[in-house]
A protein has these predicted regions:
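Proteins that catalyze or organize thiol-disulfide redox chemistry
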Residues: 1-53, 60-127
Length: 127
């Protein structure tokens, strides 16, 4: 793992998430060929986008996190912004697709997303 990525564990997950901003998590395992193929792409993006937190979760060591995210195939990329999970992508993304994904995340109107989350929470309390 390069200096530009964070190794996520159950112990540091909440603190990492609370930092806010964009968080990209690569769920991987050492035995996974596609994971090993995606690793240099993920590391290169981490070096290029220093304002984003890039993190990796070894699904063999962190089975609790993998279960919490219902990881069924690896690699899987989980995307957060300002502490809100925006989605997951299963499979190794090519560099251009990862760059496109990062731009899409940057372009999201988070005030609108936060309003939608608050409305759903309010609606859930009424049920």
């Amino acid at each position: 793992m390069g200096a530009t990525t964070v190794e996520l564990t159950e112990a540091n997950f909440e603190d990492t998430l609370k930092k806010g901003g964009i968080l990209l998590i690569d769920f991987w395992a050492a035995w996974c060929g596609p994971c090993r193929a995606f690793a240099p792409t993920f590391e290169a993006a981490a070096g290029k986008h220093t304002d984003i937190t890039f993190a990796k979760v070894d699904t063999e060591k962190e089975k609790g996190l993998a279960a919490a995210f219902e990881i069924r195939s690896i690699p899987t990329l989980a995307v957060f912004r300002d502490g809100i999970m925006l989605g997951q992508n299963a499979g190794a993304l090519p560099a251009d697709a990862l760059e496109k994904k990062i731009q899409q995340i940057r372009d999201i109107d988070m005030e609108k997303v936060k309003d939608e989350v608050a409305a759903r929470a309010k609606q859930a309390k009424q049920v």
